[in-house]
Structures are given as C-alpha cells and as structure tokens.
C-alpha cells in the first residue's frame, strides 16, 4: 500500500484528534512522545504524520506535500484553498463570536471598528448583515482591543468564554460554530483513492459510533 502523509496542527486540536486515529487502528505512539520532532511514522500502518502550524495545514495539503490534513473550520473559512473537505470530525468545537465591553451597542448605526485575527470571515459576516465596519487585523490577543479603545468590538473564537470573562468582555453575537475537519488533496484522492477512502470511511464510522 502507498504511504499516506497526514498533516496535523500542533496543540489543542492535535490532542483531540490523536485518539480518533488510535481508535481506527493507527499507531500514534511517536506522536505522543515527540520531543522536538515534526515528522512521524506510524509503526503499524503506511501512515506518516507531520506537525505544522494550523494556518499551514491546508497549504501543505493543497500543494500535495500532505495527502490528508486535520484543521479547524476557521482556517478553511478564512483562507480559501483548493482542497476537498471530507469530514466534520466533531471535535475541537467552538464558536466565532462578536464580543466587547458591556457598554458596547451592537445596534448603533455609526461605523464600528472590529478587531480580529480573521478579517475575511469578519468582513463577510458584517457585509451579509448590511453593516459597514472597519476591520483592524491583530495577530496577538484581541481581547485587549476594546479595553484600550482600539476597537469597538472583537471577532474571535470562543470555546469556554473564560478568557473573555477574565478581561471583562461579554459575547454579543454568536456567528458560526466550528470544529475540526478532515481535508484531502485533490490529486491524491485520485492516485491514492483506496488508501484515503479507507481512512475516511473508518474515521466516519468511528465518529458515528461515538454519537
């Protein structure tokens, strides 16, 4: 069987996804004891893994370096890539929200300034609502923007809401629910069809059995 390379994102999503691969019989012991390594071979299958930044997973898949990728829906929404989205894995679930300080008025007619790491998603959301906003792109912690007067509100991913609460912010609007997705390179789906669909189908059955 041909080797299948899977790109995973480092961090929180990685911890959610490794058990799913183990449950379908793919050894992930090297991933659990990785040290500083970034490339790993499963000991019992033709699967190898690479660990990259979340924003780069879809790029590796699009260019064929990885056959399969696991990435948050937020990355796919913000960065349009020429890939196939195969499965909603139902893990890493959170929401895009509009949040701000308690005095924020979402119904105000004046042009608002919105700070976010996700300018495309944010501009599309407000455009669809018919609202003209100024988008301020921030790479770091966006929660501070309303506190310092840089922005009227923020758009960010919210899981528990604890970070917002600790910074005195509240959620005003829930925009989109997001979760981890399995994506596939278009060319690989033709050249490695059997191997890829074997993983996709087993993963789908595992997800359905867990519901």
From Swiss-Prot:
The protein's predominant localisation is cytoplasm
Q: Which GO terms describe its biological process?
A: L-histidine biosynthetic process
What is catalysed by this protein? 1-(5-phospho-beta-D-ribosyl)-ATP + diphosphate = 5-phospho-alpha-D-ribose 1-diphosphate + ATP
Pathway, according to UniProt? Amino-acid biosynthesis; L-histidine biosynthesis; L-histidine from 5-phospho-alpha-D-ribose 1-diphosphate: step 1/9
Enzyme Commission no: 2.4.2.17
Q: Which GO terms describe its cellular component?
A: cytoplasm
Q: A GO molecular function for this record?
A: ATP phosphoribosyltransferase activity
Q: A Pfam family in this protein?
A: HisG
Keyword list, A-Z: Amino-acid biosynthesis, ATP-binding, Cytoplasm, Glycosyltransferase, Histidine biosynthesis, Nucleotide-binding, Transferase
- Subcellular compartments: Cytoplasm
Highest taxon above the source species: Bacteria
| Record CDD domains | PBP2_HisGs
Q: Where are the transmembrane segments?
A: none
Q: Does the keyword Amino-acid biosynthesis apply?
A: yes
Q: What is known of its domains?
A: Lacks the C-terminal regulatory region which is replaced by HisZ.
Q: Which family does it belong to?
A: Belongs to the ATP phosphoribosyltransferase family. Short subfamily.
This chain's function reads:
Catalyzes the condensation of ATP and 5-phosphoribose 1-diphosphate to form N'-(5'-phosphoribosyl)-ATP (PR-ATP). Has a crucial role in the pathway because the rate of histidine biosynthesis seems to be controlled primarily by regulation of HisG enzymatic activity.
Q: What do we know about how this protein assembles, alone or with others? A: Heteromultimer composed of HisG and HisZ subunits.
User: What is the protein name given in its UniProt record?
Assistant: ATP phosphoribosyltransferase
